[in-house]
């Protein structure tokens, strides 16, 4: 039997309350949702704040407003933020240092590649997109912050080239300790749909073939879809992987809470025969510094 499964709850992202009223935005809401997710079985919570483009210290403090109440009750809780959407990689990651220096964050993030993101217009053609760009130098900066502050990188894999970049760092012995790669499959709804592979067994096989021989833990997520209903969560659990859920990614037929989405994966893990990792167990699985 495979070991404990790490469940990450991505609790808000750019999902609006109009789209789902259960989406937390303010720090007090973020704290409440995070506590509920940890109680339900999540080991990691990822969230955005309600402002972009702040200076690093201000952005860090806004995150900590939501994290401190949780860590008072759950000192084992694992959090990590998103980028700060600055004009360059230094500004976009300027909050990582202050968050690490607070002593309240053990994870960071890395997006090791570039990808077109956008939805489909009425004619079915891609429109209103952006190029989310991360050069190899940007990736080096992101990993450098992890090394400097002793943070485990949570690594987004939007396309196969992202994984090849990570593997180059791993083969060179330079991948920071505590890393996890997350295979982001593209769903069929929302601004983050339409990129990369769809959530199928064949697509996961392709990623796992690239990863063959590498011992870095991996997880699956479906952005603009439903990781549970798509079936890819079960396949991942059966193959020893981990799962990310949450209202940042969800675009199913209902308006669930983050807690309910975590419960779905917990039930699936029980059905597959895998225990659910606590935050402390997740830290050991990842080998966090």
Regions found by a protein language model. Name each.
Residues 56-83, 139-142, 146, 204-215, ...:
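Alpha-helix-loop-beta-strand connector modules within alpha/beta enzyme cores
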Residues 164-165, 231-289:
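Structured C-terminal cap/extension of enzyme domains
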Residues 107-247, 254:
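Catalytic alpha/beta core domains of metabolic enzymes, predominantly
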Residues 13-32, 83-91, 128-133, 195, ...:
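Active-site mouth loops of central-metabolism enzymes
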Residues 1-22, 112-126:
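N-terminal small/glycine-rich loop or linker at the start of catalytic domains
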Residues 30, 37, 48, 108, ...:
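Conserved, mostly hydrophobic/aromatic
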Residues 28, 57-133:
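Active-site beta->alpha loop and helix N-cap motifs at the rims of alpha/beta catalytic domains
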């Amino acid at each position: 039997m495979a070991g404990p499964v790490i469940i990450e709850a991505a609790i808000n992202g750019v999902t609006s309350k109009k789209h789902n009223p259960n989406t937390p935005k303010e720090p007090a809401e973020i704290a409440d949702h995070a506590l509920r997710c940890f109680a339900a079985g999540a080991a990691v919570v990822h969230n955005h704040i309600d402002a972009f483009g702040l200076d690093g210290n201000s952005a860090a403090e806004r995150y900590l407003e939501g994290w401190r109440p949780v860590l008072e009750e759950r000192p084992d809780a694992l959090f990590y933020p998103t980028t700060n959407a600055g004009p360059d990689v230094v500004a976009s990651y300027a909050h990582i240092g202050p968050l690490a220096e607070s002593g309240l964050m053990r994870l960071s993030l890395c997006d090791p590649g570039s990808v077109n993101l956008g939805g489909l217009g009425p004619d079915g053609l891609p429109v209103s997109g952006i190029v989310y760009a991360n050069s190899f130098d940007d990736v080096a900066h992101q990993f450098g912050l992890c090394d400097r502050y002793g943070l485990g990188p949570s690594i987004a894999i939007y396309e196969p080239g992202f994984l090849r970049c990570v593997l180059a760092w791993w083969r060179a012995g330079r991948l920071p300790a505590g890393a996890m790669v997350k295979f982001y499959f593209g769903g069929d709804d929302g601004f983050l749909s339409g990129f990369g592979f769809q959530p199928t067994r064949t697509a996961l096989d392709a990623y796992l073939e690239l990863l063959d021989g590498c011992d870095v833990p991996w997880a699956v997520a479906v952005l603009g879809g439903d990781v549970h209903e798509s079936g890819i969560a079960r396949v991942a659990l059966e193959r020893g992987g981990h799962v990310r859920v949450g209202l940042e990614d969800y675009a199913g037929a209902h308006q669930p809470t983050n807690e309910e989405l975590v419960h779905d994966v917990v039930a699936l893990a029980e059905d597959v025969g895998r225990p659910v990792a606590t935050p402390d167990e997740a830290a050991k699985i990842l080998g966090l510094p």
